[in-house]
Protein backbone atom coordinates (compact mmCIF):
# COMPACT_ATOMS: atom_id res chain seq x y z
CA UNK A 1 0.00 0.00 0.00
CA UNK A 2 2.80 2.43 0.93
CA UNK A 3 4.71 1.88 -2.32
CA UNK A 4 1.56 2.27 -4.41
CA UNK A 5 0.69 5.61 -2.76
CA UNK A 6 4.24 6.98 -3.09
CA UNK A 7 4.47 6.02 -6.76
CA UNK A 8 1.22 7.90 -7.41
CA UNK A 9 2.43 10.93 -5.42
CA UNK A 10 5.54 11.14 -7.58
CA UNK A 11 3.39 11.56 -10.67
CA UNK A 12 1.90 14.78 -9.27
CA UNK A 13 3.84 17.85 -10.46
CA UNK A 14 2.45 20.38 -7.97
CA UNK A 15 3.56 18.63 -4.76
CA UNK A 16 6.46 20.25 -2.86
CA UNK A 17 6.58 17.51 -0.22
CA UNK A 18 4.57 14.80 1.47
CA UNK A 19 4.19 12.77 4.64
CA UNK A 20 2.55 9.35 4.70
CA UNK A 21 1.54 7.66 7.96
CA UNK A 22 0.32 4.07 7.86
CA UNK A 23 -0.92 2.28 10.95
CA UNK A 24 -1.91 -1.34 11.38
CA UNK A 25 -4.04 -1.85 14.48
CA UNK A 26 -4.81 -5.18 16.12
CA UNK A 27 -7.30 -5.10 18.97
CA UNK A 28 -9.34 -7.21 21.36
CA UNK A 29 -12.55 -5.91 22.88
CA UNK A 30 -14.75 -7.29 25.67
CA UNK A 31 -18.10 -6.00 26.94
CA UNK A 32 -19.56 -7.12 30.27
CA UNK A 33 -22.95 -6.65 31.93
CA UNK A 34 -22.26 -7.14 35.62
CA UNK A 35 -19.78 -10.04 35.43
CA UNK A 36 -21.33 -11.74 32.40
CA UNK A 37 -19.55 -11.47 29.05
CA UNK A 38 -21.95 -9.82 26.60
CA UNK A 39 -19.66 -9.46 23.57
CA UNK A 40 -16.12 -10.39 22.59
CA UNK A 41 -14.59 -9.24 19.32
CA UNK A 42 -11.26 -8.62 17.60
CA UNK A 43 -10.15 -6.20 14.89
CA UNK A 44 -7.26 -6.02 12.46
CA UNK A 45 -7.37 -2.81 10.43
CA UNK A 46 -5.03 -0.76 8.27
CA UNK A 47 -5.23 3.02 7.97
CA UNK A 48 -3.26 5.50 5.88
CA UNK A 49 -3.08 9.27 6.29
CA UNK A 50 -1.42 11.34 3.56
CA UNK A 51 -0.43 14.99 3.95
CA UNK A 52 0.73 16.85 0.85
CA UNK A 53 2.55 20.18 0.95
CA UNK A 54 2.47 22.89 -1.68
CA UNK A 55 4.94 25.80 -1.56
CA UNK A 56 4.42 29.23 -3.09
CA UNK A 57 5.64 32.82 -2.74
CA UNK A 58 3.87 36.15 -2.32
CA UNK A 59 5.75 39.45 -2.28
CA UNK A 60 9.02 37.59 -1.87
CA UNK A 61 7.85 35.62 1.17
CA UNK A 62 7.67 31.82 1.18
CA UNK A 63 4.52 29.99 2.25
CA UNK A 64 3.59 26.35 2.66
CA UNK A 65 0.09 25.01 2.23
CA UNK A 66 -0.95 21.53 3.32
CA UNK A 67 -3.89 19.17 3.13
CA UNK A 68 -4.47 15.74 4.66
CA UNK A 69 -6.58 12.90 3.27
CA UNK A 70 -7.41 9.40 4.48
CA UNK A 71 -6.70 6.51 2.13
CA UNK A 72 -8.34 3.12 2.49
CA UNK A 73 -6.57 -0.14 1.54
CA UNK A 74 -9.65 -1.07 -0.51
CA UNK A 75 -9.22 1.90 -2.87
CA UNK A 76 -8.16 1.41 -6.46
CA UNK A 77 -5.24 3.32 -8.01
CA UNK A 78 -7.72 5.62 -9.72
CA UNK A 79 -9.47 6.40 -6.44
CA UNK A 80 -6.15 7.04 -4.67
CA UNK A 81 -5.02 9.33 -7.49
CA UNK A 82 -8.26 11.29 -7.16
CA UNK A 83 -7.71 11.63 -3.40
CA UNK A 84 -4.17 12.91 -3.97
CA UNK A 85 -5.38 15.38 -6.59
CA UNK A 86 -8.05 16.65 -4.17
CA UNK A 87 -5.40 17.18 -1.48
CA UNK A 88 -3.07 19.03 -3.88
CA UNK A 89 -5.94 21.29 -4.93
CA UNK A 90 -6.95 22.02 -1.31
CA UNK A 91 -3.37 22.72 -0.20
CA UNK A 92 -3.13 25.82 -2.39
CA UNK A 93 -5.76 27.54 -0.25
CA UNK A 94 -3.78 27.10 3.01
CA UNK A 95 -1.37 29.95 3.64
CA UNK A 96 1.10 29.16 6.44
CA UNK A 97 4.57 30.61 6.77
CA UNK A 98 7.06 28.16 5.31
CA UNK A 99 8.51 25.48 7.62
CA UNK A 100 10.68 22.40 6.99
CA UNK A 101 9.78 18.73 7.25
CA UNK A 102 11.58 16.22 9.47
CA UNK A 103 14.85 14.83 8.16
CA UNK A 104 16.32 11.34 8.71
CA UNK A 105 18.58 10.70 11.71
CA UNK A 106 21.11 7.98 12.50
CA UNK A 107 20.36 8.19 16.24
CA UNK A 108 18.81 5.07 17.72
CA UNK A 109 15.24 5.30 18.99
CA UNK A 110 13.96 3.63 22.15
CA UNK A 111 11.46 0.79 21.98
CA UNK A 112 8.22 0.97 23.96
CA UNK A 113 7.75 -2.10 26.16
CA UNK A 114 4.33 -3.59 26.80
CA UNK A 115 2.59 -6.85 27.62
CA UNK A 116 0.32 -5.97 24.68
CA UNK A 117 3.19 -6.73 22.30
CA UNK A 118 1.62 -10.08 21.47
CA UNK A 119 -0.70 -11.73 18.96
CA UNK A 120 -2.83 -13.03 21.84
CA UNK A 121 -4.49 -9.78 22.90
CA UNK A 122 -7.55 -11.67 24.08
CA UNK A 123 -5.52 -13.18 26.94
CA UNK A 124 -4.41 -9.67 27.93
CA UNK A 125 -8.04 -8.54 27.96
CA UNK A 126 -8.91 -11.47 30.25
CA UNK A 127 -6.18 -10.35 32.71
CA UNK A 128 -7.69 -6.86 32.74
CA UNK A 129 -11.14 -8.35 33.31
CA UNK A 130 -9.85 -10.33 36.29
CA UNK A 131 -8.40 -7.17 37.84
CA UNK A 132 -11.72 -5.35 37.36
CA UNK A 133 -13.88 -8.11 38.83
CA UNK A 134 -11.65 -8.91 41.80
CA UNK A 135 -13.68 -9.66 44.96
CA UNK A 136 -14.22 -6.52 47.06
CA UNK A 137 -16.33 -5.98 50.16
CA UNK A 138 -18.38 -2.92 49.33
CA UNK A 139 -22.02 -1.88 49.17
CA UNK A 140 -21.45 -0.39 45.72
CA UNK A 141 -21.50 -2.79 42.78
CA UNK A 142 -20.03 -3.09 39.30
CA UNK A 143 -22.81 -2.60 36.77
CA UNK A 144 -20.89 -2.96 33.51
CA UNK A 145 -17.42 -2.81 32.01
CA UNK A 146 -15.87 -2.41 28.57
CA UNK A 147 -12.27 -3.37 27.77
CA UNK A 148 -10.26 -2.34 24.71
CA UNK A 149 -6.71 -3.60 24.12
CA UNK A 150 -4.68 -2.76 21.02
CA UNK A 151 -1.21 -2.67 19.55
CA UNK A 152 -0.41 -0.41 16.63
CA UNK A 153 2.38 -0.76 14.08
CA UNK A 154 3.20 2.69 12.71
CA UNK A 155 5.27 3.66 9.69
CA UNK A 156 6.07 7.27 8.78
CA UNK A 157 7.60 8.17 5.42
CA UNK A 158 8.20 11.64 4.04
CA UNK A 159 9.71 13.35 1.01
CA UNK A 160 12.89 14.25 2.93
CA UNK A 161 13.87 10.59 3.29
CA UNK A 162 12.38 9.78 6.69
CA UNK A 163 11.29 6.13 6.81
CA UNK A 164 10.73 4.90 10.36
CA UNK A 165 8.74 2.14 12.05
CA UNK A 166 7.64 1.75 15.67
CA UNK A 167 4.92 0.19 17.79
CA UNK A 168 2.60 1.78 20.31
CA UNK A 169 0.09 0.24 22.69
CA UNK A 170 -3.23 1.22 24.17
CA UNK A 171 -5.48 -0.22 26.82
CA UNK A 172 -8.74 1.47 27.77
CA UNK A 173 -11.50 0.54 30.20
CA UNK A 174 -14.91 2.03 30.90
CA UNK A 175 -16.62 1.00 34.12
CA UNK A 176 -20.03 1.90 35.54
CA UNK A 177 -20.65 1.39 39.25
CA UNK A 178 -23.86 1.92 41.19
CA UNK A 179 -25.08 2.03 44.78
CA UNK A 180 -28.62 2.03 46.22
CA UNK A 181 -28.05 2.61 49.95
CA UNK A 182 -29.05 6.31 49.95
CA UNK A 183 -32.32 8.09 49.27
CA UNK A 184 -31.78 7.61 45.52
CA UNK A 185 -29.69 5.37 43.31
CA UNK A 186 -26.22 6.61 42.40
CA UNK A 187 -24.40 5.63 39.21
CA UNK A 188 -20.82 6.65 38.41
CA UNK A 189 -18.91 6.34 35.15
CA UNK A 190 -15.13 5.90 35.25
CA UNK A 191 -12.44 5.24 32.67
CA UNK A 192 -8.71 4.76 32.48
CA UNK A 193 -6.04 4.38 29.80
CA UNK A 194 -2.81 2.42 30.05
CA UNK A 195 -0.24 0.75 27.82
CA UNK A 196 0.43 -2.56 29.54
CA UNK A 197 -1.50 -4.95 31.75
CA UNK A 198 -1.27 -3.67 35.33
CA UNK A 199 -3.37 -5.45 37.92
CA UNK A 200 -2.35 -2.93 40.61
CA UNK A 201 -3.36 0.16 38.62
CA UNK A 202 -6.70 -1.27 37.48
CA UNK A 203 -7.55 -2.80 40.86
CA UNK A 204 -6.84 0.50 42.65
CA UNK A 205 -8.98 2.42 40.17
CA UNK A 206 -11.97 0.09 40.61
CA UNK A 207 -11.65 -0.01 44.42
CA UNK A 208 -11.51 3.79 44.59
CA UNK A 209 -14.48 4.17 42.23
CA UNK A 210 -16.57 1.73 44.29
CA UNK A 211 -15.66 3.60 47.46
CA UNK A 212 -16.58 6.95 45.89
CA UNK A 213 -19.87 5.52 44.58
CA UNK A 214 -20.79 4.41 48.09
CA UNK A 215 -19.79 7.78 49.55
CA UNK A 216 -21.78 9.67 46.95
CA UNK A 217 -24.88 7.71 47.88
CA UNK A 218 -24.57 9.21 51.38
CA UNK A 219 -23.39 12.70 50.35
CA UNK A 220 -25.09 15.90 51.53
CA UNK A 221 -25.22 19.18 49.65
CA UNK A 222 -22.20 21.38 50.22
CA UNK A 223 -22.48 24.48 52.41
CA UNK A 224 -20.94 27.81 51.44
CA UNK A 225 -17.42 28.18 52.83
CA UNK A 226 -15.76 31.60 52.57
CA UNK A 227 -12.19 30.39 53.02
CA UNK A 228 -10.85 26.85 53.30
CA UNK A 229 -7.93 24.78 52.03
CA UNK A 230 -8.99 23.00 48.84
CA UNK A 231 -7.30 19.75 47.82
CA UNK A 232 -7.66 18.73 44.18
CA UNK A 233 -7.17 15.02 43.42
CA UNK A 234 -7.55 12.38 40.72
CA UNK A 235 -7.75 13.35 37.03
CA UNK A 236 -8.26 17.03 37.81
CA UNK A 237 -4.65 17.15 39.03
CA UNK A 238 -3.39 16.15 35.58
CA UNK A 239 -5.68 18.73 33.98
CA UNK A 240 -4.45 21.42 36.38
CA UNK A 241 -0.77 20.81 35.59
CA UNK A 242 -1.47 20.53 31.86
CA UNK A 243 -1.87 24.31 31.96
CA UNK A 244 1.92 24.56 32.15
CA UNK A 245 2.32 22.25 29.17
CA UNK A 246 0.09 24.60 27.19
CA UNK A 247 1.85 27.76 28.36
CA UNK A 248 5.31 26.46 27.37
CA UNK A 249 4.21 25.18 23.95
CA UNK A 250 5.80 26.83 20.92
CA UNK A 251 2.39 27.30 19.28
CA UNK A 252 1.01 29.23 22.29
CA UNK A 253 4.15 31.37 22.52
CA UNK A 254 4.08 32.11 18.78
CA UNK A 255 0.41 33.12 18.96
CA UNK A 256 1.21 35.37 21.95
CA UNK A 257 -1.20 33.41 24.15
CA UNK A 258 1.51 32.53 26.69
CA UNK A 259 3.33 34.43 29.43
CA UNK A 260 6.26 32.00 29.41
CA UNK A 261 9.73 33.40 28.72
CA UNK A 262 12.94 31.38 28.61
CA UNK A 263 15.05 31.97 31.73
CA UNK A 264 12.28 33.67 33.71
CA UNK A 265 10.43 32.27 36.73
CA UNK A 266 6.91 31.48 35.58
CA UNK A 267 5.66 31.47 39.19
CA UNK A 268 7.02 34.94 39.88
CA UNK A 269 8.94 36.06 42.96
CA UNK A 270 8.50 35.26 46.67
CA UNK A 271 6.95 31.83 46.15
CA UNK A 272 5.59 30.45 49.43
CA UNK A 273 4.69 26.92 48.37
CA UNK A 274 6.21 24.28 46.11
CA UNK A 275 8.19 25.18 43.02
CA UNK A 276 7.39 23.66 39.66
CA UNK A 277 9.67 21.04 38.13
CA UNK A 278 8.19 19.57 34.95
CA UNK A 279 9.71 17.29 32.32
CA UNK A 280 8.48 15.85 29.04
CA UNK A 281 9.06 12.07 29.01
CA UNK A 282 8.49 10.43 25.59
CA UNK A 283 9.02 6.93 27.01
CA UNK A 284 6.83 6.89 30.13
CA UNK A 285 6.07 3.36 31.37
CA UNK A 286 2.41 2.36 30.98
CA UNK A 287 1.40 5.47 29.05
CA UNK A 288 -0.47 4.91 25.76
CA UNK A 289 1.05 8.21 24.57
CA UNK A 290 4.62 6.86 24.67
CA UNK A 291 6.32 6.80 21.27
CA UNK A 292 9.89 7.19 19.97
CA UNK A 293 8.81 9.55 17.17
CA UNK A 294 6.09 12.16 16.76
CA UNK A 295 3.69 12.32 13.82
CA UNK A 296 6.20 14.37 11.80
CA UNK A 297 8.73 11.52 12.12
CA UNK A 298 10.96 13.51 14.50
CA UNK A 299 12.99 11.48 17.03
CA UNK A 300 11.84 12.25 20.59
CA UNK A 301 13.97 12.80 23.69
CA UNK A 302 13.40 13.86 27.31
CA UNK A 303 13.22 17.63 27.93
CA UNK A 304 12.98 19.83 31.04
CA UNK A 305 10.27 22.49 30.73
CA UNK A 306 10.46 24.11 34.16
CA UNK A 307 13.15 23.87 36.82
CA UNK A 308 12.21 25.37 40.19
CA UNK A 309 9.67 27.48 38.32
CA UNK A 310 12.13 28.77 35.71
CA UNK A 311 11.20 28.16 32.06
CA UNK A 312 13.99 26.15 30.41
CA UNK A 313 12.62 25.45 26.95
CA UNK A 314 9.59 25.72 24.70
CA UNK A 315 8.25 22.51 23.20
CA UNK A 316 6.33 21.47 20.15
CA UNK A 317 6.30 20.22 16.59
CA UNK A 318 8.62 21.40 13.84
CA UNK A 319 6.35 24.09 12.41
CA UNK A 320 5.95 26.44 15.38
CA UNK A 321 9.43 25.71 16.72
CA UNK A 322 10.80 26.84 13.35
CA UNK A 323 8.76 30.05 13.54
CA UNK A 324 10.26 30.81 16.98
CA UNK A 325 13.77 29.88 15.89
CA UNK A 326 14.13 27.20 18.59
CA UNK A 327 15.18 23.56 18.33
CA UNK A 328 12.04 21.42 17.94
CA UNK A 329 11.40 18.91 20.72
CA UNK A 330 8.69 17.23 18.68
CA UNK A 331 5.18 16.61 19.97
CA UNK A 332 5.58 14.83 23.33
CA UNK A 333 2.41 14.14 25.30
CA UNK A 334 3.79 12.50 28.47
CA UNK A 335 4.82 14.81 31.29
CA UNK A 336 6.20 14.31 34.79
CA UNK A 337 5.79 16.75 37.69
CA UNK A 338 8.13 16.51 40.67
CA UNK A 339 6.20 15.77 43.90
CA UNK A 340 6.21 17.99 46.97
CA UNK A 341 7.71 17.45 50.41
CA UNK A 342 4.47 17.00 52.39
CA UNK A 343 2.48 13.77 52.63
CA UNK A 344 -1.28 13.74 52.07
CA UNK A 345 -1.71 13.28 55.82
CA UNK A 346 0.32 16.44 56.46
CA UNK A 347 -1.70 18.36 53.87
CA UNK A 348 -4.85 17.43 55.80
CA UNK A 349 -3.89 18.76 59.25
CA UNK A 350 -6.03 21.89 58.86
CA UNK A 351 -9.70 22.00 57.76
CA UNK A 352 -10.00 21.20 54.06
CA UNK A 353 -12.30 20.27 51.20
CA UNK A 354 -10.84 17.35 49.23
CA UNK A 355 -12.52 17.21 45.83
CA UNK A 356 -12.65 13.68 44.44
CA UNK A 357 -14.87 14.08 41.38
CA UNK A 358 -15.82 17.09 39.28
CA UNK A 359 -18.81 17.19 36.94
CA UNK A 360 -16.51 18.88 34.44
CA UNK A 361 -13.21 20.39 35.61
CA UNK A 362 -12.27 23.32 33.39
CA UNK A 363 -8.85 24.85 32.91
CA UNK A 364 -8.34 27.70 30.45
CA UNK A 365 -4.90 27.27 28.83
CA UNK A 366 -4.59 31.03 28.19
CA UNK A 367 -6.15 32.87 31.15
CA UNK A 368 -5.41 30.23 33.80
CA UNK A 369 -8.99 30.22 35.08
CA UNK A 370 -9.94 26.85 36.56
CA UNK A 371 -12.68 25.19 38.59
CA UNK A 372 -16.03 23.51 38.21
CA UNK A 373 -18.91 21.89 40.04
CA UNK A 374 -17.97 18.85 42.09
CA UNK A 375 -20.00 15.69 42.43
CA UNK A 376 -18.13 14.32 45.42
CA UNK A 377 -15.86 15.82 48.06
CA UNK A 378 -14.77 15.26 51.67
CA UNK A 379 -15.01 18.25 54.00
CA UNK A 380 -12.98 18.13 57.22
CA UNK A 381 -14.21 20.85 59.60
CA UNK A 382 -11.41 20.34 62.11
CA UNK A 383 -13.20 17.58 63.99
CA UNK A 384 -14.98 15.24 61.59
CA UNK A 385 -15.24 14.45 57.89
CA UNK A 386 -18.46 15.20 55.97
CA UNK A 387 -19.20 13.71 52.55
CA UNK A 388 -20.55 16.51 50.33
CA UNK A 389 -21.57 17.20 46.72
CA UNK A 390 -23.12 19.86 44.46
CA UNK A 391 -20.65 22.57 45.42
CA UNK A 392 -18.21 24.41 43.18
CA UNK A 393 -14.89 26.23 43.16
CA UNK A 394 -13.22 28.72 40.85
CA UNK A 395 -9.78 30.25 40.81
CA UNK A 396 -6.88 31.34 38.67
CA UNK A 397 -3.62 29.41 38.32
CA UNK A 398 -1.54 32.58 37.97
CA UNK A 399 -2.73 33.51 41.47
CA UNK A 400 -2.73 29.99 42.92
CA UNK A 401 0.88 29.23 41.88
CA UNK A 402 2.19 31.83 44.32
CA UNK A 403 1.30 29.38 47.09
CA UNK A 404 0.27 25.83 46.40
CA UNK A 405 1.52 22.54 47.79
CA UNK A 406 1.97 19.14 46.15
CA UNK A 407 1.66 15.78 47.87
CA UNK A 408 4.69 13.58 48.35
CA UNK A 409 2.63 10.65 47.05
CA UNK A 410 2.58 10.22 43.28
CA UNK A 411 0.05 8.85 40.83
CA UNK A 412 -0.26 8.24 37.11
CA UNK A 413 -3.21 9.25 34.95
CA UNK A 414 -2.55 8.15 31.35
CA UNK A 415 0.22 10.54 30.22
CA UNK A 416 0.62 12.33 33.57
CA UNK A 417 2.96 11.21 36.35
CA UNK A 418 3.24 13.39 39.42
CA UNK A 419 1.70 14.48 42.73
CA UNK A 420 -1.50 12.73 43.71
CA UNK A 421 -2.92 15.90 45.26
CA UNK A 422 -2.57 19.69 45.08
CA UNK A 423 -3.48 21.90 48.06
CA UNK A 424 -4.51 25.50 47.37
CA UNK A 425 -5.03 27.55 50.56
CA UNK A 426 -7.91 29.89 51.33
CA UNK A 427 -10.31 29.18 48.49
CA UNK A 428 -14.02 29.89 48.49
CA UNK A 429 -16.36 26.92 48.10
CA UNK A 430 -19.80 27.78 46.77
CA UNK A 431 -22.75 25.83 48.11
CA UNK A 432 -26.07 26.29 49.88
What are these model-predicted stretches?
Residues 4-7, 16-28, 77-166, 201-238:
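Acidic low-complexity segments
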Residues 9-10, 37-41, 129-136, 159-167, ...:
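A generic local secondary-structure boundary/capping motif
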Residues 16-49, 144-164, 295, 351-372:
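Structured beta-strand/loop patches that form or line metal/cofactor-binding pockets in enzymes
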Residues 26-89:
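N-terminal alpha-helical targeting/anchoring segments
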Residues 31, 126-205, 251-277:
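Extended amphipathic alpha-helical scaffolds
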Amino acid sequence: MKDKIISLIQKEKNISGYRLITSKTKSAEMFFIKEKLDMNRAKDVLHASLTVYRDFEENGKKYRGSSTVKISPTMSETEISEKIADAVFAAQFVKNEWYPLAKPTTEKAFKVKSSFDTDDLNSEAVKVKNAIYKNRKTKAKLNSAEIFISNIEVQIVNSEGVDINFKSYNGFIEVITNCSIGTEDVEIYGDNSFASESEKLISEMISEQLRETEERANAKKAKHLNSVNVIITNKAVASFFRFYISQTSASMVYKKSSRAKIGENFQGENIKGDKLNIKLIPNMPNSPMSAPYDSDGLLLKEHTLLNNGVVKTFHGAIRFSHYLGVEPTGSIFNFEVEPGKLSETELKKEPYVEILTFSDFFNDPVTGDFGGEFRLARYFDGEKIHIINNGSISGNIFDAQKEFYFSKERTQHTSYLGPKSILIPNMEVLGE
